Protein backbone atom coordinates (compact mmCIF):
# COMPACT_ATOMS: atom_id res chain seq x y z
CA UNK A 1 0.00 0.00 0.00
CA UNK A 2 1.39 3.38 -0.88
CA UNK A 3 0.74 6.42 1.22
CA UNK A 4 0.33 10.02 0.14
CA UNK A 5 2.97 12.49 1.30
CA UNK A 6 2.08 16.17 1.01
CA UNK A 7 4.49 19.06 1.51
CA UNK A 8 2.75 22.36 2.20
CA UNK A 9 3.81 25.92 1.36
CA UNK A 10 4.70 26.51 5.00
CA UNK A 11 7.81 24.35 4.54
CA UNK A 12 10.90 26.33 5.57
CA UNK A 13 13.37 23.95 3.94
CA UNK A 14 15.09 22.91 7.17
CA UNK A 15 15.45 19.25 6.00
CA UNK A 16 14.45 17.84 9.43
CA UNK A 17 11.85 15.64 7.74
CA UNK A 18 14.40 14.35 5.23
CA UNK A 19 16.80 13.35 8.00
CA UNK A 20 14.02 11.73 10.07
CA UNK A 21 12.78 9.44 7.28
CA UNK A 22 14.11 5.88 7.73
CA UNK A 23 13.40 4.93 4.09
CA UNK A 24 14.70 8.08 2.35
CA UNK A 25 11.29 8.91 0.89
CA UNK A 26 11.91 12.67 0.99
CA UNK A 27 14.50 14.46 -1.11
CA UNK A 28 15.14 18.20 -1.12
CA UNK A 29 15.30 19.75 -4.59
CA UNK A 30 15.21 23.31 -6.00
CA UNK A 31 11.85 24.36 -7.44
CA UNK A 32 10.70 27.00 -9.92
CA UNK A 33 10.26 30.41 -8.34
CA UNK A 34 12.17 29.52 -5.19
CA UNK A 35 13.73 32.30 -3.18
CA UNK A 36 17.21 32.18 -1.67
CA UNK A 37 17.74 29.02 0.38
CA UNK A 38 14.16 27.79 -0.14
CA UNK A 39 13.77 24.23 -1.29
CA UNK A 40 10.89 21.84 -1.80
CA UNK A 41 10.75 18.11 -1.28
CA UNK A 42 10.12 15.40 -3.82
CA UNK A 43 8.42 12.49 -2.06
CA UNK A 44 8.91 8.96 -3.40
CA UNK A 45 5.69 7.69 -1.89
CA UNK A 46 6.07 4.11 -3.09
CA UNK A 47 8.71 3.61 -0.37
CA UNK A 48 6.75 5.33 2.43
CA UNK A 49 6.03 2.98 5.34
CA UNK A 50 3.66 5.42 7.07
CA UNK A 51 5.72 5.87 10.24
CA UNK A 52 5.07 9.66 10.22
CA UNK A 53 8.53 10.45 11.63
CA UNK A 54 8.72 13.30 9.12
CA UNK A 55 5.63 14.86 10.73
CA UNK A 56 7.13 14.56 14.21
CA UNK A 57 10.40 16.13 13.08
CA UNK A 58 8.78 19.19 11.48
CA UNK A 59 9.62 22.31 13.55
CA UNK A 60 6.95 24.57 12.06
CA UNK A 61 3.73 25.19 13.92
CA UNK A 62 1.88 24.49 10.69
CA UNK A 63 3.07 20.88 10.25
CA UNK A 64 4.42 21.46 6.76
CA UNK A 65 4.67 17.77 5.91
CA UNK A 66 1.78 15.32 6.27
CA UNK A 67 1.55 11.60 5.59
CA UNK A 68 -1.88 10.32 4.68
CA UNK A 69 -2.10 6.57 5.14
CA UNK A 70 -3.83 4.65 2.36
CA UNK A 71 -6.99 4.06 4.41
CA UNK A 72 -7.19 7.77 5.32
CA UNK A 73 -7.13 8.81 1.67
CA UNK A 74 -9.64 6.19 0.52
CA UNK A 75 -12.00 7.09 3.36
CA UNK A 76 -11.86 10.78 2.48
CA UNK A 77 -12.69 9.93 -1.14
CA UNK A 78 -15.58 7.66 -0.11
CA UNK A 79 -13.83 4.53 -1.34
CA UNK A 80 -13.54 2.58 1.92
CA UNK A 81 -15.42 -0.70 2.28
Curated annotation (Swiss-Prot):
[4Fe-4S] cluster 1 binds at residues 11, 14, 17, 58. Residues 2-31, 39-68 form the 4Fe-4S ferredoxin-type domain. Binds 2 [4Fe-4S] clusters. Cluster 2 is most probably the spectroscopically characterized electron acceptor FA and cluster 1 is most probably FB. Its EC number is 1.97.1.12. [4Fe-4S] cluster 2 binds at residues 21, 48, 51, 54. It comes from the Eukaryota. Its cofactor is [4Fe-4S] cluster. GO terms for biological process: photosynthetic electron transport in photosystem I. It is found in: Plastid, Chloroplast thylakoid membrane. It catalyses: reduced [plastocyanin] + hnu + oxidized [2Fe-2S]-[ferredoxin] = oxidized [plastocyanin] + reduced [2Fe-2S]-[ferredoxin]. Keywords: 4Fe-4S, Chloroplast, Electron transport, Iron, Iron-sulfur, Membrane, Metal-binding, Oxidoreductase, Photosynthesis, Photosystem I, Plastid, Repeat, Thylakoid, Transport. GO terms for cellular component: chloroplast thylakoid membrane; photosystem I. GO terms for molecular function: 4 iron, 4 sulfur cluster binding; electron transfer activity; metal ion binding; oxidoreductase activity. It is a peripheral membrane protein. It is an enzyme of class 1 (oxidoreductase). The keyword Iron applies. The eukaryotic PSI reaction center is composed of at least 11 subunits. NCBIfam families: PS_I_psaC. PANTHER family: PHOTOSYSTEM I IRON-SULFUR CENTER, PHOTOSYSTEM I IRON-SULFUR CENTER-RELATED. Apoprotein for the two 4Fe-4S centers FA and FB of photosystem I (PSI); essential for photochemical activity. FB is the terminal electron acceptor of PSI, donating electrons to ferredoxin. The C-terminus interacts with PsaA/B/D and helps assemble the protein into the PSI complex. Required for binding of PsaD and PsaE to PSI. PSI is a plastocyanin-ferredoxin oxidoreductase, converting photonic excitation into a charge separation, which transfers an electron from the donor P700 chlorophyll pair to the spectroscopically characterized acceptors A0, A1, FX, FA and FB in turn. This is Photosystem I iron-sulfur center. It comes from Dioscorea elephantipes. The gene is psaC.
Amino acid sequence: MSHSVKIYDTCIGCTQCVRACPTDVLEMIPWNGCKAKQIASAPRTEDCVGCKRCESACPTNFLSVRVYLWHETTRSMGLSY
